[in-house]
Amino acid sequence: GFYVWDIESLDDPRIKAKAKKLEGNPLPVKEIKSRLAKARAAGWEMIYERHTADVRKYMDRCHIDLGGVSPNLTTKDLLRGMDISSPALRYLEELYFQYGRYLMVGSSRPGTLPAGLQGKWNNIRCAPWTGAYWANVNVQMNYWPVFNCNLAELVSPYYDLWNANFKEKQRIAKEYLKEITGKDVDDVWMSGTENSAY
């Protein structure tokens, strides 16, 4: 399991229940190794074709044309010699728009966790902002373009995360408001700034 402590010795029943729920989940190493072996067996070209076909279903839903002209330069060289009025700049803006969409397509699919502040690609053990889902507009900003870009289903992981935690957030809000006002309030909820999927 994920835990090294003895679940039965936990004092808080809420933590105990959550730990028990997750205790049976195996570490993903075995599954990851299996998927990597299948990918190696399929080969680069097959993986690339499959990926391209999958992503194209989403990317073909929205187009942008700012009159950009694709120069025969790397992005780094393009940025280095940028002329504010050049068609190459408009190309770079188009590329940036498409790259943002590509990252969303790759990091938020129905049935998965939502895109975090580092998407799905964080390679740092102690990620900036703890790799959490921050409820102070940071994570929400990831999802601002999905509706305008005809990618509405990609927001479902974000909704799923918040809906799964709604009852607990409502309970915390009731306790907090009772503590500071002395009143029972039923139609409230709150979220801490930092939130974890676990």
Regions found by a protein language model. Give the residues of each.
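Acidic/polar, glycine-enriched structural segments that form the non-catalytic walls/loops
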Residues: 1-133, 151-174
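Bulky hydrophobic/aromatic packing residues
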Residues: 130, 145-149, 175-181
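Well-ordered alpha-helical segments within folded domains of soluble proteins
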Residues: 136-147
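Active-site-adjacent "gating/activation" loops or surface patches in catalytic cores
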Residues: 171-198
